[in-house]
Amino acid sequence: MQIFLVLALCGLAAAVPSEDRKLSDKATTLADRSTTLAFNLYHAMAKDKNMENILLSPVVVASSLGLVSLGGKATTASQAKAVLSADKLNDDYVHSGLSELLNEVSNSTARNVTWKIGNRLYGPASINFADDFVKNSKKHYNYEHSKINFRDKRSALKSINEWAAQTTDGKLPEVTKDVEKTDGALIVNAMFFKPHWDEKFHHKMVDNRGFMVTRSYTVGVPMMHRTGLYNYYDDEAEKLQVVEMPLAHKLSSMIFIMPNHVEPLERVEKLLNREQLKTWASKMKKRSVAISLPKVVLEVSHDLQKHLADLGLTEAIDKTKADLSKISGKKDLYLSNVFHAAALEWDTDGNPYDADIYGREEMRNPKLFYADHPFIFMIKDSKTNSILFIGRLVRPKGDKMRDEL
């Protein structure tokens, strides 16, 4: 039997929880496990020599693993939990914890960001979804169930891509151009995220600059500039800079990690783990920083199947071993693809800034953070301490400017 599962997470937060509402131990635990997943999966992907830009939402990938666990049995289910470092937790704990975490972090109203997330399950015309699976998957991961005829591949792909575009208000026009295997389960995450800065960039402080993809290849990008007080650390030993920019409502922030000079990110990526992030955070101090960032319109679609397999999800993707029988009651499904598609934009938009700050002593002699070459970034949620997105910008959109020798 063939089934096509399109998973993203749209409208998970139906109500706005109070900012001081305490998370349950379940949600806190799953937030912690999703952070571990963030670094594990990022490193697995960064090993791919053909990979350029990376854009992941660890909490959304965690929900995909939760869904595999929900629809699987025996080792198929336990491996999904193990990749999430949740194999010691019972099923109800995992599903309810993820549900609460996702409802919290996807509350874009409370966080004053734009986060479009959608959720759909496609199956063939012949499938009968198990009632318990439909009920529990909707309860915990909030997605609809639909059927699709993949005998007409062109029409099916068009339907999936149009759904993704509609879900993201046209920001994500395409999830995939093709699906090679059409006899297995297909997971697709589709989302659009746009941060709203705590202090905006002035719209007139934008000009065209060069972004050095490599020392010999430069593209033109719109670069925006502002000076403000930010948490900042200059790691002289590792020859890199770390800066944290709060987003509106200060419930989340963007962290940028950039080597001092243009170079492959491999050296910096080898340093990247949660303990190193804590170390950098402990050394950051609020000070004046002159920041130049490219305006970003980033659209990335990853097939995570291989990378999740590298982390231990091997049985669900094996046609001869997978047991996803809780989805339909039949043991003839396997996971053929895990597409994780996201669009990310940031520009000058944000809250008004206090112009009086520029006369203060503390604003003198700002540090320079000039992001004109590849860097790593994270979007971190302050309440749950989870990483909403992790990625790297290696090749932004832009026309080639020149070759350099």
Curated annotation (Swiss-Prot):
<dbReference type="InterPro" id="IPR042185">
    <property type="entry name" value="Serpin_sf_2"/>
</dbReference>
<keyword id="KW-0325">Glycoprotein</keyword>
<feature type="glycosylation site" description="N-linked (GlcNAc...) asparagine">
    <location>
        <position position="107"/>
    </location>
</feature>
<dbReference type="GO" id="GO:0004867">
    <property type="term" value="F:serine-type endopeptidase inhibitor activity"/>
</dbReference>
<protein>
    <recommendedName>
        <fullName>Serpin H1</fullName>
    </recommendedName>
</protein>
<comment type="similarity">
    <text>Belongs to the serpin family.</text>
</comment>
<feature type="signal peptide">
    <location>
        <begin position="1"/>
        <end position="15"/>
    </location>
</feature>
<dbReference type="InterPro" id="IPR036186">
    <property type="entry name" value="Serpin_sf"/>
</dbReference>
<dbReference type="GO" id="GO:0005518">
    <property type="term" value="F:collagen binding"/>
</dbReference>
<keyword id="KW-0256">Endoplasmic reticulum</keyword>
<keyword id="KW-0732">Signal</keyword>
<dbReference type="InterPro" id="IPR023795">
    <property type="entry name" value="Serpin_CS"/>
</dbReference>
<dbReference type="GO" id="GO:0005783">
    <property type="term" value="C:endoplasmic reticulum"/>
</dbReference>
<dbReference type="InterPro" id="IPR000215">
    <property type="entry name" value="Serpin_fam"/>
</dbReference>
<keyword id="KW-0143">Chaperone</keyword>
<dbReference type="GO" id="GO:0005615">
    <property type="term" value="C:extracellular space"/>
</dbReference>
<feature type="site" description="Reactive bond homolog">
    <location>
        <begin position="364"/>
        <end position="365"/>
    </location>
</feature>
<dbReference type="InterPro" id="IPR033830">
    <property type="entry name" value="Serpin_H1_serpin_dom"/>
</dbReference>
<dbReference type="GO" id="GO:0005788">
    <property type="term" value="C:endoplasmic reticulum lumen"/>
</dbReference>
<keyword id="KW-0346">Stress response</keyword>
<feature type="short sequence motif" description="Prevents secretion from ER">
    <location>
        <begin position="402"/>
        <end position="405"/>
    </location>
</feature>
<dbReference type="InterPro" id="IPR023796">
    <property type="entry name" value="Serpin_dom"/>
</dbReference>
<dbReference type="GO" id="GO:0030199">
    <property type="term" value="P:collagen fibril organization"/>
</dbReference>
<dbReference type="Pfam" id="PF00079">
    <property type="entry name" value="Serpin"/>
</dbReference>
<dbReference type="InterPro" id="IPR042178">
    <property type="entry name" value="Serpin_sf_1"/>
</dbReference>
<comment type="function">
    <text>Binds specifically to collagen. Could be involved as a chaperone in the biosynthetic pathway of collagen.</text>
</comment>
<feature type="glycosylation site" description="N-linked (GlcNAc...) asparagine">
    <location>
        <position position="112"/>
    </location>
</feature>
